[in-house]
Amino acid sequence: MLLSAIRKKGFTLVEMLVTLTIVSILALAILPLAKTAVKREREITLKRNLRMMREAIDAYKKLADEKAFEFDEDTEGYPPDLETLVEGIEAKMEANEDNEEVTKVIKFMRRIPKDPMTNSYDWGLRSYQDDPDSDIWGGENIYDVFTKSPGTALDGTKYKEW
């Protein structure tokens, strides 16, 4: 009688092994899904960062085309580096009520974002004068940015081509 009461209180070794096997199989099935979710999140962050920097470059170019500030003609109106987009420029704004031209510092980005694929702040840069397929930056200006990651996205495209 005492022996049967002890058996009912605990698990047998077989029950523990079966439970451990089932949990292991479930964990192995979920692992690829978790890796895909992490990769997808990094891709979303990369797209967001690229879009933010490209919009900042476009805003800088628009002000240059409007002659709102002085720039070196060799740059074609594009920023000379990413730091310029963070530090900002002194732009001439519309006249105030005294018909005086007002100068204002305009910043295009708060900071240079981190590349989620390379985990660094080092981005691939392309100038207006560079070949569109070139990975080498001429240094004249910044026309476009891209990641330096050689990886392939979930949709099969190369990250460098984004």
Each model region followed by its residue ranges:
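Membrane-proximal N-terminal amphipathic helix
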Residues: 38-65, 77
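N-terminal leader/signal peptides at the extreme start of proteins
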Residues: 1-9
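Internal alpha-helical transmembrane segments of multi-pass membrane proteins, especially GPCRs
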Residues: 9, 15-18
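Low-complexity, acidic interaction segments enriched in glycine
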Residues: 58-162
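Transmembrane signal-anchor/signal-peptide helices with a preference for the extracytoplasmic
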Residues: 29-41
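Alpha-helical hydrophobic helix detector
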Residues: 17-32
